[in-house]
Amino acid sequence: MGLVIVVIMFFVICFFINRNTDKELAERKKEEKNNYKKQGLYLVDDYYVKLYTGFREYGIKENVRLILFKDRIIFEIDYKVKKTILFKDIEDYRIQTESQLIERASLMKVACFGVLGLGMKGKEKEVNREYVYIKAVYEGEVANIIFERGIGENEKIIQELHRLIKEYKNMDISNNVITE
C-alpha cells in the first residue's frame, strides 16, 4: 500500500513540474518574441536542426537553431553565432533526398572537371533520406545549405518557409523597411 502511495505522489509531482516547465517555456518564448519585435523583427517559429553544410567555417553541427522571421532566416550556431539570410537572397528551397544531393554533386564534378569528373568515384547506394536544401546568397557568395530535422518535420519547415516567402513577395516593400 505504501508503494502505491509513493508511486502516485511521484506522478503528481512530475505532472506539476512538467506543467510549470511548459508555462516557463511559453513565457520565455513570448518574451523573446517581444524582444525581437523591439528590433523590428517578427519571429514566426523556431526549430532545432542538424546542419550538414552551408557555411564554410562549420562542418556538421547538431542542435543548430533555425529561427524563421517574416523576412529572413537566422541560423544560430553554438548558441551565439548568428547567420542571417534574407528572403530576397534565397534563390531555391526544397526537400531533396540523399540520392538527389549526390546527383547534384556529380553534376558539379562534371562542371568542374569536365569528362574526367565522370570517372570520379562517389557513393553508389540508393538512399532516400530527406533533407532541406536552400540555395541562397550569403555574404556575396552562393551558399548551398543542407539541414534536416526528421521525418515529417522537414516538410513542415519547407511549407512554413514557402508560406513566409510568398507573403514576403506579396508585401508592398516600398512601405516596409527591411533591416539587415
Language-model regions, residue ranges each:
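Anionic N-terminal interaction surfaces
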Residues: G2-R72
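Beta-strand residues in well-ordered beta-sheet regions across diverse protein folds
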Residues: F69, E76-I77, K135, I146
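Glycine-centered tight beta-turn/hairpin loop motif at sheet-sheet or coil-to-beta transitions
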Residues: K61, D78-K80, V137-V142
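Short, solvent-exposed coil/turn segments at beta-strand boundaries
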Residues: R65-I74, K88, E139-G140
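Short, surface-exposed coil-to-beta transition loops
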Residues: K61-N63, K80, V127-V132
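Short, surface-exposed charged micro-motifs
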Residues: N63-R65, K82, D92
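Phosphoinositide-dependent membrane-docking surfaces
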Residues: I73, T84-L101
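Acidic, Ser/Thr- and proline-rich intrinsically disordered linker/docking segments
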Residues: Y93-E180
